[in-house]
Amino acid sequence: MSATTLPNVSVAIIGAGIGGLTLGAFLRRLGIPFVILERTAVLTPLGAGISLAPNCLAALEQLGLYETIRQNAQELRGINVYREKRCWGTIDFGLAKQWFGYNVLSIERYEFHRYLYEAAGGAGVVQLGWDVARIEGLENADGDLRVISADGREVHTDIVVGADGIRSVTRRILSRSMGLQPENTIRFTGRVHMSGYTKPLSHLSTTDLGIGHWMLYNDCILTTWPCKENRQWFIGVKAAPPDEKSPDRSVWKGATSDTVNAVYGSRFHPFGEDGTVEASMYAIPAPAIAGNSRDDKLSIIPNASSLATSSRKPTSRTWFGAEWRSWVMVYRT
């Protein structure tokens, strides 16, 4: 066996995101040999927060992760829905455990990712810098598959699982092998997103713990989700300029704290010390992210590829958390 060939495994998982790591963690518990091939050379924190529903937590308990996550997450007790300053009502999550066996929990995404990484076996099974170029042996009935990277490394396996996200290399390779032609059905909705994470909001009381907000302003949206220590994970949505037709641009591109506060800074928010978003969400300085992304269904997908390499200095003040990034929203026709 050459130095560029990994030992044979039963399953090769392409992608070390949440899906790939979760599958790896289950395979590890079952004693099934596997490897996870990740294109990124260095794993860095991505995303702001994530909410975990009861069906997800049931699976995580099977992996032995539930107690760790519960201790480091915040229970979601309710979401207050506002139209400008008027409260339309509250979505009560208090019965989730009674009905489904678990509460809904919110946790920092990178922390959740780290727990899954360790549960899957960490560096012992996750191969970084694996830019998959091709999969050979798809025509073989005996299941002998070879996953080959752009730099010539390869792994022999019985099963290949594509867990590599919306721009899936696995899907493209399989489509070509089946003679399918790609079709671009993506359309830009004209909505762009940003997300981030605040520092602990010390002025909030214990009654505020676990309460989220959907703020429906006339020309934009801001949703805030409770996390541990009264920190808030937030998502903002804003319309692009009327003449903006390209999903490759963003109204947040090159944004500074002034740009963001021009959209949300003076808006009403119940957690604001003076009733405004800027007061409720002020945090440590944050670098600006110039990239955006696109998806092939109605959802939001992050792109923080420029975060690690950005030379831009942090702005002096912003109501964001330690980092924030931008999205575009697209849909499939």
UniProtKB/Swiss-Prot annotation:
Residues that span the membrane, as ranges: 6-26
InterPro entries, sorted: FAD-bd, FAD-dep_Monooxygenase_BioMet, FAD/NAD-bd_sf
EC number(s) per entry: 1.-.-.-
Disruption phenotype: Abolishes the production of most pyranterreones, but accumulates high amounts of pyranterreone 5.
Keyword Oxidoreductase (UniProt): yes
Signal sequence bounds: none
Localization (cell): Membrane
Main location: membrane
GO MF entry, a single one: FAD binding
Keyword entries, A-Z: FAD, Flavoprotein, Glycoprotein, Membrane, Monooxygenase, Oxidoreductase, Transmembrane, Transmembrane helix
Induction: Expression is positively regulated by the cluster-specific transcription factor pytR.
Top-level class of the enzyme under EC nomenclature: oxidoreductase
Entry-linked Pfam families: FAD_binding_3
Described purpose of this protein according to its UniProt entry: FAD-dependent monooxygenase; part of the gene cluster that mediates the biosynthesis of pyranterreones, a family of antioxidative compounds. The first step of pyranonigrins biosynthesis is performed by the hybrid PKS-NRPS synthetase pytA that condenses 4 malonyl-CoA units ato the acetyl starter unit by the modular PKS of pytA. The acyl chain is then connected to an L-serine through the amide bond by the modular NRPS of pytA. A tetramic acid is formed and released from the PKS-NRPS pytA to give pyranterreone 5 with the help of the thioesterase pytI.
Name of the protein in question: FAD-dependent monooxygenase pytG
Organism: Aspergillus terreus (strain NIH 2624 / FGSC A1156)
